[in-house]
């Protein structure tokens, strides 16, 4: 019995280091997301189409369309160690973008849970420039 316990303990120790280097993204409500975007060094990433972006986006947001054929090439140019606040219209595309970013090695990712729709419903500012 002691031998079995020792084998299990050693196996658990060695296998605990096998889980990948992924951190879960965090889904935030509009107010929390706004606070996150105002933190120093956080990059706000709008993954909607350019047409959606020009109709109204968060201040200082960078636009990279997750559904364009260039998304992976564009995110490859970004700093993987930076913190990103990612949003779209409803939260679906931003979650897809976050999953792709995780697969590319990004670890500090925050999602606007219900997208810019939630942001606007909360009365938070959008810009069109």
Question: Residue spans of the language-model regions?
Answer:
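Short, surface-exposed ligand- or partner-binding patches at beta-edge/loop junctions that are enriched
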Residues: 87
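Structural scaffold elements adjacent to functional motifs in cytosolic proteins
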Residues: 44-46
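Rhodanese-like catalytic fold shared by cysteine-dependent sulfurtransferases
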Residues: 2-8, 13-42, 51-83, 92-129
């Amino acid at each position: 019995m002691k031998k079995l316990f020792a084998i299990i303990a050693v196996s658990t120790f060695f296998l605990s280091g096998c889980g990948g280097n992924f951190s879960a993204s965090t889904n935030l409500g509009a107010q929390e997301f706004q606070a996150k975007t105002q933190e120093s060094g956080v990059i706000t990433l709008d993954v909607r189409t350019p047409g959606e972006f020009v109709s109204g986006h968060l201040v200082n947001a960078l636009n990279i369309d997750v559904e364009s054929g260039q998304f992976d090439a564009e995110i490859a140019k970004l700093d993987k160690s930076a913190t990103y606040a990612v949003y779209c219209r409803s939260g679906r595309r931003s979650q897809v973008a976050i999953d792709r970013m995780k697969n590319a090695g990004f670890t500090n990712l925050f999602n606007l849970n219900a997208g810019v729709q939630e942001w606007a419903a909360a009365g938070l500012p959008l810009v069109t420039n």
